Amino acid sequence: MEQNLSKTPIKWRASAIVLAICLVLMVVTSVIGHNIQTSGGTVRTEELTFTTDVGATSHAKLYISETATAETPAPAILLCHGYTASLDAMESNAIELSRRGYVVMALDMYGHGESTLPPDGYKQAEMGNVENYAPDLGSYSALQQFKNYDFIDLTKIGMLGHSMGTAAIQEGAYLAYSKWQAAYTAAYAEALAAGSDETTAAYTAYGAAMNSGIVLPGSMVLTGYNYNVRNINDLTYNGVTAENGVFPLYAAPINICTIQGTYDEFSGLLWGVEDSSQYTTSFKFAYGTGGATNVPSGTYFMYGDASATPLTREEAVTAAASAAVTMKPIRAAYSFNGTHSDTYYDETAIGYGIDFFDITLRGGVATIAPTEQVWHGRAACGLIGLIATLVAFVALALTLLRVPFFSTIVRPAAPSISTVHGAKGVIGYIIPYIIFLLPAPLLYYWLIGYPYYMQPQWFKFLTKFMPNSFFNMAPMNSLMLFNGVVGGVFLVLYLLVFFLIGRKKGANLETTGLKLPFTQILKSLLLAVLSFAGIYAVVYACSALSGTNFSFFKFNIMPMDSTHWVAFFKYLPVWLLFFLLCGVIYNSLTRINNAPAWLNYLLCAVVSCGGLAMMFAYDYGKLFATGVRGIQYIPGTTSPEWLAAVGMSFPTALAGIMLFGLLFILPITAVMSRVLHKKAGSVWLGGFLTAFIVLVFTISHMVISI
C-alpha cells in the first residue's frame, strides 16, 4: 500500500541534496557543453544582431575558428533551421563545420529565437514588390554580413538549411543573384551607352557586378526539403506540376546537394512522393538538377545531365571549382535512414554535408574526416542538463515546502476514489482507465491540424485556430485548442465517474484534492512561482555564461525574450486549468489507494499520454515498416468535397513531429504531479508548477507567426 507521506515530516534534506545535485549537473553540463561547442577553445563564438533588408532585427551566432585570419581567410557557411526551432537546432552542424576551420553563422529565422518579424508594409523588388512577402526569412541579409569580416574568403560561401530553412536559403540565394544580375544589367547598359562594344560592355559589367559588394553563395546543402520549383506562369508556388515548373536558380553557378531521410514525414507534401526513399523520382528533383531522375544516393553529377552520369570525387572537385566560369555546377543526392527531424542529429546526414562542402569549397581537402564527429557530447550535455532542470523544479519546491511559511500548505491527502480488490475491482478500474486514454488520440490530429503559419512566406496551412494579434503563435494555438477540448472531455468523464461511482464510495470535494483554504492556494501559487523562477534563473545564467542551452532534439527549456514572455502569460490560463484538472485525475482517480507507490507513478505516467503513445507507435511503426505513415492526412481533408473546395489534403506530418515533445514531457509532469500531491496533500502546488513547466517547455523555442 502506498504510504501517505503528507502525514510524515517532509524529508527536506533529501530534496535539498537532490536540488544540489541538479544544480551541479546544470552547471557542469553547461561548462562541458561550452568546451565541446568551442572545440576546446580553438573556436570562439560571437552573438550578433543586424537589421535586414526589410527592416527586421535578426539574431545570429558566429563560430570562428582560430585558423580563420585576415592572412588566411576561411570559407564561411550560413546555417538556417526549420520551423518551430531556433539557431540552437543547427548546433551539431555548427560544431562539426567550425572545428574543421569553416566560419559558421547560425541564424534565427524571422519570428524564431531572438529574430523579429519585419514591420508591416515591407517589400522586396526581386519578389515582385509584393507587400509583406520576404520568403528568404532573413537569409539574404545574413549572407551579406559575411563581407564585414576580413577573416572570411568571400569567394567560398556555402549555405545549409533544414526544412523551412532550406526553402529560405534558396530564396536568399535567389535574392543575391537577382541583385547581382541587376547590377550587371545596369553596368552593361551604361557601358553600351558610353560607346563600348558588346564584348567590352559585358566584361566591364561583369567587373562592376563582382565589385558591387553582393555576397554570392557557391555551394548549398538542402536537407529535409525540395528544390524550390515555381509555376512558370506566375512564378508562385501554386499549382506547380511536372509540365509548368521552373527552378529559379537554374542559371546560377551554385553547386547543390540534397540530403533526405528515407522516412521523412513531409515527403508527400514537399516532393510529391509519399515514400521518401524515392524522392529523386520527383519532378521537382528533375527541375532542380536539370533533368536527372531516379538518382542513387551518393551520386555526384553535372547539372543538366539527365542521365546523372556519376562523377568521381576528383571530377566533382574539378567541376565544382570551375562552376562560376563554365556555368556548369554539380549536383549531389543523398539519403540516410532517418525521419525529417533526424537530420539535426544524424551522423550520416551531417557527414554528407561536411563532405559536400569540403568538395565544393575546399578543393576536396578534408582537415578532419567527415565521419569523425564530436557533437554527441554536446547533445548529451543538453539532455542531461534538461533532465536536471526538470528535476530541480520539483526539488526546489519540496525544499521550500519545509520553510515554515509554506509548511502550512501541507495536509493529509484524502483517499482516492480507486481501491482495487479482486478481479471485479480490476475490471472496474481498467474500464474507466482505458476510456480516459481515448480522447487524446481520437482528437489529436483533427484539433492540431497543420499549424504552419509564416506571414513573411505567405504560407498559411490548415489550423482551426489561426494566429491573431493576441494569440500570435500558430502551433501554440493548436495546442491550446487541444488542451481546451480534450480537457473539457476529461472534465465530463471525471464528473460522471465522480458522481456515478465516487459518491457511492464516499467521495467528496476533499477527495479531488482541491479543498484548500484560499490563502493556502495563494501560498501554493507563490511556492510554484518561486520554484519555477528560481530554477529558470539558473537556466538563464548557464546560457549566458556558457553560450549553450538545455536542449536535445525537440526537447527544450531555454531563455525567452520579452516577446515570448508576453506570449507565455497569454497562454498560461489554459495551461493552468488543464494541468490542475490533470492533477485531480491523476491523484483522485488514477491513483489506487492499496497499490504500491511505483505502480501509481507508472499508472499516472501512462494515463497522461498512453493513448497518444499507442497512436504514435502505429503511425511511425508503419512508416518504418513500409516507408509511408499509418495516419497520413488530417481527418476530413481527403474527402471529395474537401478536395473540390480546397484542392489538397493536409498531412499530419507537423502534428506528428510536435507529438515527440508531448510524449517526453507529459509523463514526466504526471509523475511530478503525483510526487507533489503526496508531499503537499492537494493538487494545487503540482497543478501550478507543472503548468509552468509544460508551457515553458513548449513555448520557449516557439515561432511568432504574426
Regions found by a protein language model. Give the residues of each.
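Alpha-helical transmembrane segments of integral membrane proteins
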Residues: 431-706
